[in-house]
A protein has these predicted regions:
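Conserved catalytic core of sirtuin-type NAD+-dependent deacylases
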Residues: 1-191
Length: 191
């Protein structure tokens, strides 16, 4: 009963507002089979050779690229994940004109896969992997294909041989200022 009341209240808020901004994180994508970080089944409660916050740091990417990409491919990229009801409902709200934008901490790209157009990805996206040499961009499937690797399992750019870095914000890195400013601007317009 309590959950039903909350859903009705949420629907009332949606129906009575015109400039909605949705701010979400890992919980939105768990129904799509993507684990969060802090729940009982989350990444922080699983056993790895190093803690996840270490493996997802910039210094670990630099010093242990093979282990970084092994973890990244196995635990951060979910090529088979599909948008769930929440992703689809948000895209529907955007199409109706009620939703200004989605601000997300998720890196899975499921909001866009559901049809959302204005998505501020605070932590980046696994679907963009950038050559640090020439700036070429490769998708997640390319990184997971293992077609272009050095001898350590680290993806390298076929155009220039430069190392690839996922366009995700790692520990020790700052958020993208343009993304942050866009999200703050939209949030300030929300009613």
């Amino acid at each position: 009963m309590e959950e039903e009341r909350k859903i009705e209240e949420l629907q009332r808020l949606i129906d009575t507002h015109e400039n909605i901004v949705f701010f979400g994180g890992a919980g939105v994508s768990t129904e799509s089979g993507i684990p969060d970080f802090r729940s009982v089944d989350g990444l922080y409660h699983q056993q790895f050779a190093y803690p996840p916050e270490v493996m997802l740091s910039h210094s670990f990417y630099e010093s242990h690229p093979s282990e970084f990409f092994d973890f990244y491919r196995r635990k951060m990229v979910a090529l088979d994940a599909k948008p769930n009801r929440a992703h689809r409902k948000l895209a529907e709200l955007e199409a109706s004109g009620s939703l200004v934008s989605v601000v997300t901490q998720n890196i899975d790209g499921l909001h866009q896969a559901a049809g959302s157009k204005r998505v501020w990805e605070l932590h980046g996206s696994v679907h963009r992997n950038v050559c640090r040499g020439c700036g070429a961009v490769y998708d997640a499937a390319w990184v997971c294909s293992r077609e272009h690797e050095d001898g350590r399992g680290v993806p390298v750019c076929p155009a220039c041989g430069g190392p690839i870095k996922p366009d995700v914000v790692l520990y020790e890195e700052a958020l993208d200022q343009d993304v942050l400013e866009g999200a703050v601007t939209d949030i300030a317009r929300a009613d």
